[in-house]
Design a protein with these regions (language model features):
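C-terminal-of-GTPase-core extension/linker across diverse P-loop GTPases
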Residues: 2-8, 12, 141-263, 280, ...
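Short glycine-/polar-rich loops that comprise or flank the Walker A/P-loop
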Residues: 15-17, 49-51, 298-302, 325-328, ...
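Short glycine-/small-residue-rich Rossmann-like dinucleotide-binding loops
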Residues: 240, 275-276, 300, 307, ...
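Generic enzyme active-site microenvironment
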Residues: 271, 305, 331
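Inter-motif core of Ras-like GTPase G domains
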Residues: 285-309
Length: 454
């Protein structure tokens, strides 16, 4: 990492301020070539955490005013010498300032390269780096809080404490096995078992919160389904807060899938308003029905809508069959009209049924509560450690599996060496989670998801 990188760190759009970030051994010297300070002092003469007003020059011509902020290694985001040039936020202006920096010796940064350098320089671990991306892309307040908690080290501290328990047990076993003639007390089976179970319970707790954690950070694929004209599109509009789907009294109005991302309580839903499910001779409508069934298979959460003002028919019951063994909330719409639906049948078939009038906007609070309960986000504490990425889940499950093998080996009386192999494998999995022993390919994959400039 001897080279110096640069990129626009703010969105490329018109705005009040644009920031060009430069990081690397020669960052300050390169910035001195393009910034002439109002005071006449060079940036190289400034201490870290110092700002200087000046002008940016491209090919000896002033192109904008700026404020240059100097950070000296290791006290910077990347752990390297860093300069952030804040200029006016026009698209052309920021591109021209970046051009001046690149002409002066920096190279364009790759996607996520600033944060990757922060990771490689020990400024943050891999789980914290992933939290940076989650914080940037957060769409809900709970997701933002959870991402910041992870960035602030909540997950890292939890994993480190669990690793410490395992490493202590492993060291005691290794010492007793390697130095049998020394007066090292043998680690009792009960003590060893307690250590393994303590860590196992901690990992199980983390896994139990994974779905809820992922729901508030990444959002949930949600399908709105039902037969034609039960109010699916009206529900979509109610949750969206505006007319996203066309609503008419004509059955089969929605044929294609209409999508929208909305925040409902603590969770972000990626809604899909699907075509009404029924047998049809209309080719276009039939294609829409097939697409709806495919979306049901993909969905994590299903909102099944029924017309409360009409009796349940065979189409309704076929929809219930599609929902078997899935996370489903039954929504009885048109609660403003006299009820004719078999509510007892719905309640016996579905774990949760709520009543709304999408047309009148009634029942939204009850529906929000039902969604949060179904996803487990109603009880989640965003200040506590949680795993929110698939990579973290895989590492946690791998460590848990190794500990279960260790317990089995202990219970059947296998040697301490055999048990220790399982414990060491669990530690390896946890160290991969935090990135302390992650493979290069894993690290590259994590940072490939970042934007340039971060």
């Amino acid at each position: 990492m001897s080279d110096t990188i640069a990129a626009v760190a703010t969105p490329l759009s018109a705005g009040g301020i644009g920031v060009i970030r430069i990081s690397g051994e020669s960052a300050i010297e390169i910035a001195d070539k393009v910034v002439r300070t109002t005071s006449g002092k060079s940036l190289a003469s400034l201490k870290g955490y110092t700002a200087a007003h000046g002008k940016v020059y491209l090919e000896n011509e002033a192109i904008d005013e700026c404020v240059a902020l100097v950070f000296r290694a290791p006290k910077s985001y990347t752990g390297e010498n860093t300069v952030e040039i804040s200029c006016h936020g026009g698209v052309l202006v920021t591109k021209q300032v970046l051009r001046a920096v690149l002409q002066s010796g920096a190279r364009p940064a790759e996607a996520g390269e600033f944060t990757k350098r922060a990771f490689l320089n020990g400024k943050l671990d891999l789980s914290e780096a992933e939290a940076v991306m989650s914080l940037i892309s957060a769409q809900g307040q709970q997701g933002m809080k959870a991402a910041f908690s992870t960035l602030d080290g909540a997950l890292s501290r939890k994993i480190d404490s669990l690793c410490s328990i395992l490493l202590s047990a492993s060291a005691n076993m290794a010492a007793w096995v390697d130095y049998p003639d020394d007066e090292i007390p043998e680690l009792s089976n009960d003590s060893l078992k307690n250590s393994i179970v303590t860590v196992k319970n901690g990992l199980t707790s983390l896994l139990s919160k994974f779905d809820a954690g992922k729901a508030i950070t990444d959002g949930v694929e949600t399908a709105i389904i039902g037969k034609p004209n039960v109010g699916k599109s009206a529900l979509m509009n109610m949750l969206s807060g505006f007319s996203r789907s066309i609503v008419t009294d004509i059955a089969g109005t929605t044929r294609d899938i209409v999508e929208e991302t909305v925040r409902v309580g603590n969770v972000v839903l990626r809604l899909a308003d699907t075509a009404g499910i029924r047998e049809s001779d209309d080719l276009v409508e039939s294609i829409g029905v097939d697409m709806a069934k495919t979306r049901i298979e993909r969905a994590t959460l299903i909102l099944a809508v029924f017309d409360g003002s009409a009796s349940l028919d065979q189409s309704d019951k076929e929809i219930l069959d599609l929902c078997k063994d899935r996370d489903v909330i039954g929504i009885v719409n048109k609660s403003d009209l006299p009820s004719k639906a078999d509510i007892d049948y719905l309640k016996a078939t579905l774990s949760k049924v709520v009543f709304i009038s999408a047309k009148e906007g009634e029942g939204e609070e009850e529906l929000t509560k039902a969604i949060e309960e179904a996803l487990g986000t109603d009880k989640i504490d965003t200040s506590q450690a949680m795993i929110t990425t698939e990579r973290q889940r895989v590492c946690t499950e791998k460590a848990l599996s190794c500990l279960e093998e260790a317990l089995d080996a202990l219970n059947i009386g296998m040697t301490m060496d055999a048990i220790n192999v399982c414990i060491e494998s669990a530690v390896e999995a946890l160290l991969e989670l935090t990135g302390k022993k992650a493979r290069e390919a894993v690290v590259d994959e994590v940072f490939s998801q970042f934007c340039v400039g971060k």
